[in-house]
Amino acid sequence: MKLKKMNLPYISNTYDVRKIMFLVVLSCIPGLCTEIYFFGCGVLIQTLLFVIISLLFEIIILKMRRKNIKNSLFDYSSFLTAVLLGLSTPCALPWWMIIFSCFFAIVISKYLYGGLGQNIFNPAMIGYVVLLISFPVHMTAWNEKNSSLSFYNDIKKSINLILFYNKLNNSKKKICPDNFTEATPLDDFKTKSHFDYDFFPEESAVKKKTKIVSIAWKYINISFLIGGCFLLYKKVICWRIPLSFLSSLIFFSSITYFYSQKFFCSPLFHLFSGGTMMCAFFIATDPVTTSCTKIGKIFFGLIIGFLVWIIRNYSDYPDGIAFSVLFANMIVPLMDAYLKTSGYGHKNL
């Protein structure tokens, strides 16, 4: 019998970095399938393009740094970043925007700080925020799937939009009901809350399409909730961050909702709109950019939930997931410094 030599401490760990990243990517499949069902095959094509470009950027950086490409490339960290970017951005973005986002996510946010384990900001959220600030019109265009198209025609149309032509390239867009239908439920509610009358009262088609998009986001969030429960069951992520984030969002949204149901969304609406569930289980739980302590993880989730509530209600951005996560990433070193625990047998300071 051949014995395996091990160093102290003798603690078995069933999950390495590669397996953790693989399980997280696997848990994204329900959300990916749901987005494809509601928004078309452009989601899949765009996600694959994000993956290919991200891996190419990583290969270039590893070559420049003379690192082992096989070990670094197949830890699935950049693969996961690309998948999260593909799922969080509207489908049919132009190819050059995808390259722009991947450059900031992989080169700037990850390898400029030293690579995996050294970055202080979530790479996927950096890539998302860069697109949101630079191209806000494209980032709010969530078009529903054309049910009249076949599977082949849907793929062909998506490839043409991404690689050759994009209908949003026109700098001048007229304000019409067709533009309104591209809004997410959070966009829709924020627009209507500024008016005392019904926006486009006679446009029944607009209301119908807006309702379809609202239903789509509910099922998308439920799909990510299922994937998140799988990660909790496999003990890949810690329960403290999702629980504290969702509890904070429910608490603050309940206060404003009971104050005025006309101008503020209900807690249930906040939970199943935008990227709430994706943030709770897939983005905020990034082990590199979150706090190392148990109490720090709770504060981390509470801060994100509070900031999401603030941005959704009082800013021009309909969803504040990315900005909230990045701001919380900034204060993680401060939390780890003041919330660190002492060693065994010593009193906490």
Curated annotation (Swiss-Prot):
The chain crosses the membrane at residues 20-40, 42-62, 83-105, 120-140, 212-232, 236-256, 263-283, 291-311, 319-339. It comes from the Bacteria. The modification FMN phosphoryl threonine is found at residue 184. Keywords: Cell inner membrane, Cell membrane, Electron transport, Flavoprotein, FMN, Membrane, Phosphoprotein, Translocase, Transmembrane, Transmembrane helix, Transport. Its cofactor is FMN. It is found in: Cell inner membrane. InterPro entries: NqrB/RnfD, RnfD_bac. Its EC number is 7.-.-.-. Pfam families: NQR2_RnfD_RnfE (PF03116). GO terms for biological process: electron transport chain; transmembrane transport. Belongs to the NqrB/RnfD family. Part of a membrane-bound complex that couples electron transfer with translocation of ions across the membrane. The complex is composed of six subunits: RnfA, RnfB, RnfC, RnfD, RnfE and RnfG. This is Ion-translocating oxidoreductase complex subunit D. It comes from Buchnera aphidicola subsp. Schizaphis graminum (strain Sg). The lineage of its organism: Bacteria, Pseudomonadati, Pseudomonadota, Gammaproteobacteria, Enterobacterales. The gene is rnfD.
